[in-house]
Amino acid sequence: MQGYLAEKASQGVAYDLRNALFEKIERLGFGYYDRQETGQLVTRLTSDVEQIRTFAGSGVVQLASAAIMLLGTTVLLLFLDLQLALVALATVPAIFVLLLRFVQRIGPLFRGVQQALGRLNTVLQEDLSGVKTIRAYAREDYETDRYREVNDDLLGRNLETVRTFANNFPFVFFVANLGTLGIVLFGGLRVIGGTLTVGELIAFNTYLGFLLFPILTIGFLSAAFSRAGASAARVFEILDAPIEVEDKPDAVALPPVRCRVEFDGVRFRYPGDEREVLKGVSFCVEPGQTAAILGTTGSGKSTLVNLLPRFYDVTGGAVRLDGHDVRDVTLSSLRSQVGIVLQETLLFSGTVRDNIAYGRPDATLDEVEAAARAARADEFVQGLPEGYGTVVGERGIGLSGGQRQRIAIARALLVDPRLLILDDSTSAVDAETEAAIQESLDRLMREEHRTVFVIAQRVSTVRDADLILVLDEGEIAARGTHEELVRTSELYNEILGSQLEPAPAGG
């Protein structure tokens, strides 16, 4: 019964820790994920929590039992013979000093083991996610060597902890046996002197074993405690991590917006980076307008739109929707009015319908199909074996890149956003499909008077936008319509010219 209750309690601790960790991870800002490896987070949620659970269960019970046994045996030995008891107990402080030094040495080693395990999980996660790329470039041997390298590091760290055990515990046993030797010598002299009988000496020596057993048990448990402590420190690094983007104490709900978007002197740098990605960006997009963002790689296009749903907070200036600073409203009320299709399309394991309805789980099948038609996804979905009930694999395996993008667009449209953000979301579809999607989006957005932000690499995608912003090194280098920029912007014409196909050679 004692074991059952201890295990039940430890499982409860692990359950609560996993829930607390997951809830915290869900609330942490994107800046935190930019600095962390996925494998390390997975290891903290699994292996580190399990180390804590193991000690919280059997370890705590054994520690309590050993402490009670140590206290009881000490009292008994003092009662039997005060002089012999003092001789026996003389080694106890030395043993605990050795154990304390052991804990101080082994703790950082266990932390290193967990860090190495996290790196191993990171390599594994990257390998599984990029298996097609690895095969395409015939890099299997390289990845195998990379995995073996981190696995060797993990093995080395584990062996180092084993060596620390082997180098420290013989001294603990030696000091413990010194106590036994002292009892035999001092007790033998008293037997010779007639102040102690042989039977009393044997009995005392027997009880001495009950003193050494809990001390050695505590010694072995100190290793489990050190490992649990190292894991707990890693777990609490997440639990104590500051949330970079969260609701202000006096945040208010954002009312339904017409979605006039204003950037007012916006400056931004990523946490830990001194380089400014956006430098004093200012512009205004009226309700129902389509704004297109163009620029070279690294010019700050994705960063700019990431500030709209407040994935990051500006480091200077302000972003406003209908005059409301996005930092002054609740995140839920803000993001519920924003639909976003990211450049990296993610689908979850489940049916096509579940993926489209991810933002609105209560949506009817008719609503799901309407969103799919608007995204030009309905035709290929109907051709799947089970239609909208077809189960797609993890990350949308089984669908082409263009099909995944169209499902992601349908998912964004279904939430009925006042502001739609398309981050290069049609890069994987052909020109004909892109034109059809754009036509549907234009009709939907203008009928409902919605505001759209489009990031695209192709000028053909954005030439009909009401406002085109050309970014260069975090600043707006040019702005206007397509016709205006063709007349006035050298950079825009360079981008346009780079996308024109050279005329075929005559012959």
Task: Enumerate the language-model features and the residues they cover.
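Transmembrane-helix motif of ABC transporter permease domains
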Residues: 1-15, 23, 27, 34, ...
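Short active-site loops of ABC-family nucleotide-binding domains
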Residues: 11, 31, 39, 43, ...
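Helix-loop junctions and hydrophobic alpha-helical segments within the transmembrane domains
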Residues: 21, 25, 134, 235, ...
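An intracellular "coupling" helix at the cytosolic face of ABC transporter transmembrane type-1 domains
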Residues: 30-31, 47-56, 60, 64, ...
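Transmembrane helices of ABC transporter permease
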Residues: 58-112, 185-196
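Hydrophobic alpha-helical segments in the permease module
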Residues: 92-100, 165-179, 198-223
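ABC-type nucleotide-binding domain
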Residues: 247, 254-507
